[in-house]
């Protein structure tokens, strides 16, 4: 996803770079030719993507370190993020990685950007999905991940706020994970907590008794069911 925002009084709808390196902005209405304009980025959107992307770096780096997993697919959507790893992971494995990823958040580590020289780059154990040449941008989360990446990231891990794996599934012999970070994770928790409170109020049980309350209700329904 590109950044959105405004140029002068026009909304930016899309941004593309052509083969010659020229950046083109698609806007919703014409701007007078020859005038100097000010561009403003939609910061809420940008920061949201930075949180998701930075969280993915930490989780993927940990998966690589602890389970030898390679990130073979990453999709950053408007509502959720998916990570495809090339090894099967158990629920216990994923719970461990999630816990360790959030430990990295709590440490509020600096996320470092560098452009190593060719000789130095050859010695770095960095992650990359393809062979790279020329000037390579390296993103490092000290102790957690070193990755070649041209994306946007938060300045410190604490800005991610929270990393939560909401679900996972077997995928092409590996594992597909669904992840929420930062404000997305908070809003997801707030919605689900509200749902839990509504259900537990109806069942007259405490939130921590939801499962047992549901099982009791299900059993009562089964006992009184007329066939």
Residue map of PLM features:
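Active/ligand-binding-proximal structured segments within catalytic/core domains
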Residues: 1-7, 30-83
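Solvent-exposed beta-strand/loop surfaces of large extracellular or lumenal domains
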Residues: 7-22
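Short beta-strands and strand-coil junctions in structured, solvent-facing domains, enriched
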Residues: 18, 46-48, 184-187
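A generic structural motif
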Residues: 20-29, 81-87
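Short solvent-exposed strand/turn elements
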Residues: 25-34, 180-182
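Functional cores that coordinate and move charged inorganic groups
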Residues: 45, 65-171
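Solvent-exposed alpha-helical segments within well-ordered globular domains of core cellular machineries
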Residues: 61, 95, 99, 103, ...
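Terminal appendage regions of diverse proteins
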Residues: 160, 166-227
């Amino acid at each position: 996803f590109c950044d959105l925002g405004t140029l002068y009084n026009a909304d930016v709808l899309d941004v593309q770079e052509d083969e010659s390196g020229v950046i083109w902005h698609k806007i919703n209405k014409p701007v007078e030719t020859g005038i100097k304009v000010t561009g403003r980025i939609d910061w809420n959107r940008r920061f949201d993507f930075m949180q998701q992307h930075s969280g993915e770096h930490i989780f993927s780096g940990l998966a690589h370190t602890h389970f030898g997993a390679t990130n073979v697919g990453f999709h950053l959507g408007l509502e959720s993020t998916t990570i495809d790893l090339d090894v099967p992971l158990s629920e216990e494995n994923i719970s461990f990685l999630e816990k360790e990823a959030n430990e990295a958040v709590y440490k509020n580590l600096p996320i470092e950007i560098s452009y190593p020289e060719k000789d130095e780059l050859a010695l770095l154990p960095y992650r990359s999905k393809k062979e790279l040449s020329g000037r390579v941008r390296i993103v490092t989360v000290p102790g957690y991940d070193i990755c070649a990446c041209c994306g946007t990231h938060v300045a410190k891990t604490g800005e991610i706020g929270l990393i939560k794996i909401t679900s996972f599934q077997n995928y092409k012999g590996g594992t597909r994970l669904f992840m929420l970070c930062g404000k997305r994770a908070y809003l997801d928790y707030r919605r689900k907590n509200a749902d839990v409170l509504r259900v537990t109020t109806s069942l007259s049980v405490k939130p921590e008794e939801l499962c047992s309350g549901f099982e009791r209700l299900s059993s009562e329904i089964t006992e009184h069911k007329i066939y």
